[in-house]
């Protein structure tokens, strides 16, 4: 399991999104409020953003977010219109390595998977960045295309009825997300939109997304449809 968050809007620093909120990913790495599976997220973290040329950049680690002084020192200076970050709680038996931490990428999209799926139902692919289930799910989604995200998640969910398949993806101008077994909330701000596993503050504007839904964010417009 993990906790993830994404931003699409006016330029925002990674510190402002990930480290500074009173219940942001930094706090969620050791004291999440809404996490249904696992007690903390200390098995790695990752942050990705799109630079001014639209190139996806990533920083991933297999260490707890709270112990990364280097990231804390540069995060205030890293600003982007589109950011995706996650903290990881590794499934028992899965490797703990930087390549197992989200966000995964195909060069155009950044993607995080919050959940669990039986790797036996997933097609084997050499494109996966790690042997963990999340990396294989990401590779499958990339191969099918993000426009088919809803159909892909519904198919995997049918193959593994116990799967939890909360996906969060970003390409610099669009956010996509699914709810399938875990929580997701949305916050509309005057300068952009946040999608997050759980609210990172007590702003009354947060709204919960129902389970088994697809979320599509473009140009500050949020469309939510059933899966």
From Swiss-Prot:
Q: Name one Pfam family in it.
A: GATase_4
Q: Where is the Glutamine amidotransferase type-2 domain?
A: 2-227
Query: Is Iron-sulfur among the key words of this record?
Result: no
Which GO biological-process labels does this protein carry? ergothioneine biosynthesis from histidine via gamma-glutamyl-hercynylcysteine sulfoxide
Q: Spell out the SUPFAM superfamilies in the cross-references.
A: N-terminal nucleophile aminohydrolases (Ntn hydrolases)
| Alphabetical UniProt keywords | Glutamine amidotransferase, Hydrolase
Q: In which pathway does it act?
A: Amino-acid biosynthesis; ergothioneine biosynthesis
Reading the lineage from the top rank, the first entry is Bacteria
Q: What's its top-level EC category?
A: hydrolase
Q: State the EC number(s).
A: 3.5.1.118
Q: Name one GO molecular function term.
A: hydrolase activity, acting on carbon-nitrogen (but not peptide) bonds, in linear amides
Catalysis: reaction(s):
gamma-L-glutamyl-hercynylcysteine S-oxide + H2O = S-(hercyn-2-yl)-L-cysteine S-oxide + L-glutamate
The active site is formed by 2 (nucleophile)
Keyword Hydrolase on entry: yes
Biological role: Catalyzes the hydrolysis of the gamma-glutamyl amide bond of hercynyl-gamma-L-glutamyl-L-cysteine sulfoxide to produce hercynylcysteine sulfoxide, a step in the biosynthesis pathway of ergothioneine.
Quote the protein name from its UniProt record.
Gamma-glutamyl-hercynylcysteine sulfoxide hydrolase
Q: Which organism is it from?
A: Mycolicibacterium smegmatis (strain ATCC 700084 / mc(2)155) (Mycobacterium smegmatis)
């Amino acid at each position: 399991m993990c906790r993830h968050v994404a931003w699409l809007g006016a330029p925002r620093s990674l510190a402002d999104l990930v480290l500074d909120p009173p219940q942001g990913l930094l706090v969620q790495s050791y004291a999440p409020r809404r996490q249904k599976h696992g007690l903390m997220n200390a098995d790695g973290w990752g942050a990705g953003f799109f630079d001014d040329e639209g190139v996806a950049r990533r920083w991933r680690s297999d260490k707890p977010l709270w112990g990364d002084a280097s990231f804390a020192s540069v995060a205030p200076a890293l600003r982007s219109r589109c950011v995706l970050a996650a903290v990881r709680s590794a499934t028992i038996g899965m490797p703990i390595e930087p390549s197992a931490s989200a966000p995964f990428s195909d060069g155009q999209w950044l993607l995080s998977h919050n959940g669990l799926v039986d790797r036996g139902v997933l097609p084997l692919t050499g494109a996966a960045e790690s042997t963990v289930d999340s990396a294989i799910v990401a590779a499958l989604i990339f191969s099918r295309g993000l426009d088919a995200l809803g159909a892909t998640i519904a198919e995997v969910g049918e193959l593994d009825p116990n799967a939890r398949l909360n996906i969060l993806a970003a390409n610099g101008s669009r956010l996509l997300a699914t709810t399938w077994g875990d929580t997701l909330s949305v916050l509309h701000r005057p300068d952009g939109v946040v999608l997050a596993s759980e609210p990172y503050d007590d702003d009354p504007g947060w709204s919960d997304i129902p389970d088994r839904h697809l979320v599509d964010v473009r140009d500050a417009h949020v469309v939510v449809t059933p899966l």
